[in-house]
Amino acid sequence: MGLAGCPLALTLGDPAGIGPDITLLAWTARTRETIPPFVLIGDAAVLAERARALGLTVPIGEVSEASAATGLFPQALPVLPVAGLGPVMAGRPEEAAVPAVKQSIERAVSLVQKGAARAVVTNPISKAVLYGAGFPFPGHTEYLAALASAKGAPLHPVMMLASPTLKVVPVTIHIPLKDVPRLLTRDLILANIEITASGLRRYFGFKRPRLAVSGLNPHAGEEGRLGREEIDIIMPAIEAARAKGLDVSGPHPADTLFHASARSTYDAAICMYHDQALVPFKTLAFEEGVNVTLGLPFVRTSPDHGTAFRLAGTGKASPRSLIEALRLASAMSEKAEGRA
């Protein structure tokens, strides 16, 4: 079987969150819209219990190999089992589930590295629960990079939030705001610019991506009066990127970077910290937004929301972002494979 016939590998996420809900709802949506075949690396009993809570009739089929999932997908939701997951109560996360959560992520990476899956799509995890169990990585992005680089040179993963109308990249991700100025460097910003440009070319078909880089300080530093990061760090990174032939503008004041007219001038915005990128993105594209990790040797996407424990099992969770994540993962893998 070529990659075209392989399923997407969908991870378990935190089983007490809305991952099971949106997985079930995404599969049921296949009769109304195009959903690329996927296999959930998880637990059939947890899915069946959540389906009962939601009043859904969903046939669930366990498979021993991912290759069986594509043929099964039209009739049943394929599940590749993970070991060691006990009973799960919706909305009540437990550290006891962490080994199964990690196993699901590791299995997904292994499948895509072996060519048994086209891409990795991850359901939401709870960082607080993982940290409580001794998880040493800030989040999914860093863990996936560690798994992917286990046998080679370290990777530099880049988190991009993508929708049809807006793409944003935070240079720093899951760190306290007070640490951002200290951690920003010319080389870090330049690496994010280069990896973003490469990803836009490879996976999204942009021949010469236009990148807009935000400043860190109000008014992009007001020529040094409100901070020197723009002069000492950000502008040198932009100049280095331009010297390599990249189309990069900035540093721009962040407060005027996201209105409609400004968005028409670039293909992706490079921002200095998490909320500078994600607040405008989630305001403009919450349900259709997808989290993409660039800089990995495989495609990875996820919904752009969290575990939403309070919604688990209530029927109020929307599968839209997961559906868009599945579709984008499929489209990106086709582009990378030269089939689109």
Task: Locate the predicted segments by residue.
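Ligand-binding beta-strand-loop-alpha-helix segment within the catalytic cores
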Residues: 161-191
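Contiguous, glycine/small-aliphatic-enriched amphipathic segments in soluble metabolic enzymes
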Residues: 1-142, 183, 187-272, 276-291, ...
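Short, flexible loop segments at boundaries between secondary-structure elements
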Residues: 146-158, 162-166, 294-310
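A broad structural signal for alpha-helix termini and local helix breaks/kinks
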Residues: 54-55, 148-152, 175, 204
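Small-molecule pocket liners
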Residues: 38, 141, 157-158, 167-169
